[in-house]
């Protein structure tokens, strides 16, 4: 190992390229329920991406071990990992009416500072319309323990994003390109 390299952070994960981004608030921070404005994205991970899911579960366990003191708080013992909130959620049970989440897990990741956003060749993406809810890409995320206002658990921080490919926009709105893709004149007055 190169002596100048930092040891790998066991709580950091790079998701696979089939991760889909939803609720992508990555250009401007957004306040949720009156809270502090944050950059955020919901990462939709196919259940078939067992490699990414295994890395996430390992990172959640590492965050739990690293944060035992914080999770214990003023209590006498650390709550079991199975008894606290974790960010990996099942789309089939928590979002049964949303086809984008079918057969997937999802994680809501957020950050106080803007994530770096690059394309498949690692060039910065500066055009906001290139990144939208529905694109596919990799995400650099870090898991950490929290204990605030009586809520304890593991949360997910958003570091950086890499767009891999376009996808069907989520949210039901067709793009202008799709709306006007036909050469036909749909004027009903003809």
Predicted regions and their residues:
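Compact mixed alphabeta submodule
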Residues: 118, 123-190
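Structured, beta-strand-rich domain cores
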Residues: 69-150
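Residues in well-ordered beta-strands of folded domains
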Residues: 42-44, 108-110, 162-164
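OB-fold ssDNA-binding interfaces and closely related basic DNA-contact patches used
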Residues: 1-106
């Amino acid at each position: 190992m190169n002596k100048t390299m930092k040891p790998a952070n066991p709580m950091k994960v790079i998701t696979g390229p089939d991760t889909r981004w939803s609720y992508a608030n990555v250009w401007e921070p957004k306040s949720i329920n009156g809270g502090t404005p944050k950059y955020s994205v919901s990462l939709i991970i196919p259940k078939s991406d067992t490699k990414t899911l295994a890395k996430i579960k390992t990172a959640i366990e590492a965050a739990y071990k690293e944060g035992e003191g914080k999770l214990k708080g003023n209590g006498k013992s650390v709550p079991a990992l199975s008894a606290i909130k974790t960010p990996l959620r099942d789309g089939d049970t928590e979002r049964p009416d949303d086809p984008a989440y079918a057969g997937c897990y999802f994680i809501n990741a957020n950050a106080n500072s803007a994530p770096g956003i690059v394309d498949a060749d690692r060039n910065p993406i500066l055009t906001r319309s290139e990144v939208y809810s529905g694109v596919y890409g990799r995400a650099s995320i870090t898991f950490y323990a929290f204990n605030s206002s009586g809520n304890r658990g593991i949360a997910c921080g958003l570091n950086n994003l890499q767009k891999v490919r376009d996808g069907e926009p989520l949210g039901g709105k067709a793009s202008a390109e799709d709306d006007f893709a036909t050469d036909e004149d749909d004027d009903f007055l003809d």
